[in-house]
Amino acid sequence: GVIVMSLMIPFLWFFGIHGSTIVGGIIGSVLTANSLANQAILDSGMALTIENGGRIVTQQFLDQFINVTGAGMTIGLVIYMIFFAKSAQCKELGRLGGVPGLFNINEPILFGTPIVMNPFLAIPFIAMPVISGLILYFSIAVGLVPMFGGVMVPWTTPPIVSGFLVGGWKMAVLQTFILALSFFVY
């Protein structure tokens, strides 16, 4: 399920269709129910573990790790454009897309670069959310980071802050690692 969810959002965006809205509309209620189930486990006084019925894939999973800095996790591309692009146009676009990207809004990059209908940028754009989702899933499954409780933050909460708010310092560190990885993937 993580792979399908992670693939569909950027795949739809590649064609100019708002993937987060389409996929979120279909799976959002399930992810929110999973978040509430995790909160119920905590409210009952039990430890939030898989053995106690904890759910790994929640709304926080999607918002803070699959769609962080926007669909396709484009902050790596933005950083590359700002510091390493040879074209003045790309540098300027990176600067313009940087602040919105920190609030998980990346349409300036999607349409300005363009990533939409660009097969060369489609590969990292589609791959990065899958990589992020798999790293997070296995990190939670083996206990490197805690499961998501019921804490929900708005999807526009900046990265690292959002990781800390929904999962503590370990989640913020993992989110930082994944964001750094996005630079190398792009």
Residue ranges, per PLM feature:
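Transmembrane alpha-helical segments and their short flanking loops
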Residues: 39-59, 76-78, 96-99, 110-186
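A residue-level detector for conformationally permissive "hinge/kink" positions
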Residues: 8, 93-96
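Generic multipass alpha-helical transmembrane bundles of integral membrane proteins
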Residues: 1-84
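Juxtamembrane helix-boundary/capping and inter-helix hinge elements in multi-pass membrane proteins
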Residues: 84-91, 114-120
